[in-house]
């Protein structure tokens, strides 16, 4: 079973409009509300793929209750309740544009953060792989993910970590390393303080920087150009076919689902990389975020090429 961790989930609200009118009333007929957050996208895709998954994280208030109730009933859930209220994230879809209004979310009390570590530690006993995704809520220290990784390391559970900015920097500078990280070029540039291109020779050099020492897998998305990956001392390039992209949001989370599944099933490097890329591509072909149509899985799988470089 895979444990997904979403520390800052949200209720994702979609307001479709023909036109967004400023400084007046806009009436919405078809409102969509879903349980949101990067980790919950991972959860949905794993469930649709057929893997056993347990979802955890922090929820609070009536919105937190709504969120838990609106996670697929087939998914096991064990969230930790806090005093603060789970946030709303609003997307206004008008014409070909999307305007987002994102609430900051709750401020987590210090004791709540400590108590969740104990909650997490107990959940580790019943899972084989951990996937940690998304931002940290206010109130938690920037190195909080390093604490989760430390507990998972102590329990012998591999960790797929998908975060960015200061939270990722803190983990990389910690002695406690995740098994997998999946930065994109922009995030690599931010971490290193210099521009990083998609040139394969440059990426090889970058992924051997001291900052990334101790990370078993580093998987870098190159968008339509596929993926570059480092596993131990071996480098890979994944070539992908061109597809019709409907909604790319959530494709990174679907990729995390594939990586986590590959670790769970102890697949070969090539199998893990292909699965991860296929799930990311399947998500991009769907209107709904964090959703894959498994009927198209094998056709895409057969088109991907993994090369050692």
Swiss-Prot record:
Any one of the GO BP annotations = lactose catabolic process via tagatose-6-phosphate
Keywords, alphabetical: ATP-binding, Kinase, Lactose metabolism, Nucleotide-binding, Transferase
Which GO terms of the molecular function aspect are on file? ATP binding; phosphofructokinase activity; tagatose-6-phosphate kinase activity
Q: What InterPro entries does the database record attribute to this sequence? A: Carboh/pur_kinase_PfkB_CS (IPR002173), LacC (IPR005926), PfkB_dom (IPR011611), Ribokinase-like (IPR029056), Tagatose/fructose_Pkinase (IPR017583)
What Pfam families has UniProt attached to this entry?
A: PfkB
The source's domain of life comes to Bacteria
User: One cellular component GO annotation, for this chain's record?
Assistant: cytosol
Q: List the disulfide bonds.
A: none
- EC class name: transferase
Chemical reaction(s) catalysed: D-tagatofuranose 6-phosphate + ATP = D-tagatofuranose 1,6-bisphosphate + ADP + H(+)
PROSITE patterns noted in UniProt: PFKB_KINASES_1, PFKB_KINASES_2
Q: What is its EC number?
A: 2.7.1.144
Pathway the protein contributes to: Carbohydrate metabolism; D-tagatose 6-phosphate degradation; D-glyceraldehyde 3-phosphate and glycerone phosphate from D-tagatose 6-phosphate: step 1/2
Report the sequence similarity comment from the record. Answer: Belongs to the carbohydrate kinase PfkB family. LacC subfamily.
Q: Per its record, how is this protein called by name?
A: Tagatose-6-phosphate kinase
- Which species is this record about? Streptococcus pneumoniae serotype 2 (strain D39 / NCTC 7466)
UniProt lists the gene as lacC
